[in-house]
């Protein structure tokens, strides 16, 4: 009955319904990309050009397993072999440095504080490397992934690498079974997620107003970032920034987390430039959705358990439509 309750809750929250440029040296253009059309009045490649300006980024244009995507709930299939996620912090709180990268708010954990994740669709254990925030200039946009065509105000992405097979995230990002990204949608509310509250309170967020600003955070409990649900959606995709390697397994949690309107306003006041340059808000730092190309969208939400408690039989119908879609 727990799964039934979650699905019905998300129905009310509108979250889940019952469930040719010149080719130059890669090194020259390593950081030469942007999300928006204009950066200080000069041309910097926006997402539609990422794969054209750098031969090492060609997957951004020609890849068939790119991210983010629009999750159509009618295309989800229940996978009984998806186990619950297991987060191992060693029973300790962690420290990390929060950065304004000019494109994201990024939190990188100190190397002595290891947080591993396993279970779900994973065969191997993966180690948390970075937490990244995407958010919009308006509440109606900001997330990279969409749900039935709907965007959320933001998206938290926890980027993990396969530490059993690879020595670091750089090596893993280029390799099979290299990355797992846990994605959590953000909504604006009167209350705030405890973990995000630590990151976004005024005393903290104002320390990283400009590009390259950094601030140390201590005593963080990673488990507080996760919403109270064991349900998720998963698919095979890519990183959403150049070079768009198709080595990421995405796990999208079935409930959002919340931040206050003031905290969202503080995010929108972050600059993608340095103090000596013109102010340009970091907001709208998301890549447009990419074609699904018949990839399978799996979930551990068992629609068939809803029975008579569900106000309609849409979930049961979804199962049959999913099966037909996969056979096409």
Curated annotation (Swiss-Prot):
Pfam families xrefs: Carb_anhydrase (PF00194)
Disulfide bond sites: none
InterPro entries: Alpha_CARP_X/XI (IPR041878), CA_dom (IPR001148), CA_dom_sf (IPR036398), Carbonic_anhydrase_a-class (IPR023561)
MF (Gene Ontology): carbonate dehydratase activity; hydro-lyase activity; zinc ion binding
Limits of the Alpha-carbonic anhydrase domain: 31-301
SUPFAM superfamilies per record: Carbonic anhydrase
Database matches in PANTHER family: CARBONIC ANHYDRASE, CARBONIC ANHYDRASE-RELATED PROTEIN 10
Family assignment from sequence similarity: Belongs to the alpha-carbonic anhydrase family.
The protein's name: Carbonic anhydrase-related protein 10
Taxonomy of the source species: Eukaryota, Metazoa, Chordata, Craniata, Vertebrata
